[in-house]
């Protein structure tokens, strides 16, 4: 039987992130310095966090979760990002391009075609 304090902490973390109510999850490659200079990746991460909050996309109604990934295994023309469940992979995720992705894809539901490197939506098994 799990420790009740651990169960409560997990429940609180799940509630805080609104898990189960998220519509999209953005993973951004940050770190390692292979696909982009580490400082550029960190700048993009800070921008993504700030803009998701400003746009109200990370709250329960916004429905977007974000995760910093160490490596998404496409080590060229980064930072690389992927938006699930859409399965849309993006290259060159600078703050300027992230703003385009935020407005077009996450707000309006239209991927930014000139930045897309792959499109592989998740499907139910």
Features from the language model and the residues they span:
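C-terminal binding/interaction regions
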Residues: 89-125
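Iron-sulfur (Fe-S) cluster-binding segments and ferredoxin-like electron-carrier domains
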Residues: 34-53, 77-97, 102-104
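Solvent-exposed alpha-helices and their adjacent loops that cap or buttress functional pockets
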Residues: 18-20, 58-59, 82
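Short glycine/proline-enriched loop/turn "hinge" motifs that connect secondary-structure elements
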Residues: 17-21, 72-74
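Short, intrinsically disordered low-complexity segments
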Residues: 60-78, 84-86
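Small-residue-enriched alpha-helical segments and adjacent helix-cap loops
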Residues: 2-7, 23-68
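N-terminal leader/targeting and pre-domain segments
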Residues: 1-19
């Amino acid at each position: 039987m799990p420790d009740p304090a651990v169960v409560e902490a997990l429940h609180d973390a799940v509630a805080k992130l609104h898990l189960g109510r998220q519509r999209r999850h953005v993973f951004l490659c940050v770190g390692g310095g292979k696909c982009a200079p580490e400082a550029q990746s960190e700048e993009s991460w800070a921008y993504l966090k700030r803009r998701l909050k400003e746009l109200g996309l990370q709250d329960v109604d916004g429905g977007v979760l974000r995760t910093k990934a160490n490596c998404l295994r496409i080590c060229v023309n980064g930072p690389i990002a992927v938006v699930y469940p859409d399965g849309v992979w993006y290259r060159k995720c600078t703050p300027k391009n992230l703003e385009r992705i935020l407005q077009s894809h996450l707000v309006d539901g239209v991927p930014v075609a000139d930045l897309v490197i792959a499109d592989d939506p998740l499907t139910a098994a």
